[in-house]
From Swiss-Prot:
This is Carbamoyl phosphate synthase small chain. Pathway: Amino-acid biosynthesis; L-arginine biosynthesis; carbamoyl phosphate from bicarbonate: step 1/1; Pyrimidine metabolism; UMP biosynthesis via de novo pathway; (S)-dihydroorotate from bicarbonate: step 1/3. Its EC number is 6.3.5.5. InterPro entries: Anth_synth/Amidotransfase, CarbamoylP_synth_ssu, CarbamoylP_synth_ssu_N, CarbP_synth_ssu_N_sf, Class_I_gatase-like, CPSase_GATase1, GATASE. Pfam families: CPSase_sm_chain, GATase.
Amino acid sequence: MSPLLPSFPPAVLALADGSIFPGYSIGAPGETTGEVVFNTALTGYQEIITDPSYSRQIVTLTYPHIGNVGVNAQDAESDRIHAAGLVVKDLPKRVSSFRSEGALDDYLTKAGVLGIAGIDTRKLTRILRDKGAQSGAIVAGKVGDSYETLVSKALELAKAFPGMSGLDLAKVVTTQKVYEWREAEWNLHGADGKPAYGTLDTGKPINKVVAYDFGVKRNILRMLTERGCQLTVVPAQTTAAEVLAMNPDGVFFSNGPGDPGPCDYAIAAAKEIIEKGVPTFGICLGHQIMGLAAGAKTLKMKFGHHGANHPVKDLDTGRVAITSQNHGFAVDANTLPDNIRVTHVSLFDGSLQGLAWKDKPELCFQGHPEASPGPHDIAYLFDRFVELMNAASKKEGE
């Protein structure tokens, strides 16, 4: 028998291995497919589902109560929900937050995104941990629909999804036009005494930075702006020649979804920009792009890193930082060229987390120093990028 609640439409999550999870719909009706992953963050569900890096992924949140504080426009990391679907244990119907502008289920429904609640997320997470991330599908029906019909359709869809390997999604989620960004970090006590985002402080030294948008999160742009970066955001397929013609002090390669391997346009651009010696910083997919541009290889991880409690060791200082992570691919440390050194490693599995070039002003990091959600222990990497740009400018002036 299905444990569906009579007042909610029925929904089913199916995995490619045949696992079935009946529950109830908390979003739009219909069907969706994607790679099913789990995220261990306790907070930040709105930031997670609006992160473009989750494109074509069905996100399982391991924390049991999701939706407590509702949603609001300020916490979105992009202009829409990018996750293919959302899986939670329990959706509280009472929202409690002075910042809330609506409920999570309404947010999903208006965006046309499927969600399922009422399932055993602990069991699901253990399957994904032991067997690895899997193709999956959510099918959400109407009140009174047959549970058996939903199951057969969900299984069919789950087994048909090809997985994330080989998918170039950066050019799918990227901006379609060049734009300027001037919004800085959130301040509980803004200019008028009310919570608000800051703006670029033109009274301080400014660095002109071109940011490649492979699926960039807004909080990354805010943290760069907070540090005096005057940002020009460009589409993923912008050539190195176009970027270099802007005469930037630095170049940033953003986070993003999918497999870095097929992004040959980005790899070629990164290689040319790095060879020119322009200070460059990459995060997440941008980190992988820079690694590939240097001649290293990437690999698909078993279930990836998705959460806000991942310990990472800085090999230069010995310091351990708790970081936010969201990636299913990683740079293979065994394939690095001699001119690159490893700067950070994961204390969960020893995987490569950070790189620096020995002969050029370049660095990159696999995790998310901007967090959102998560800790800011590793935010000093933004400062290092600014230091690289300042040092390069000083050298040019000598």
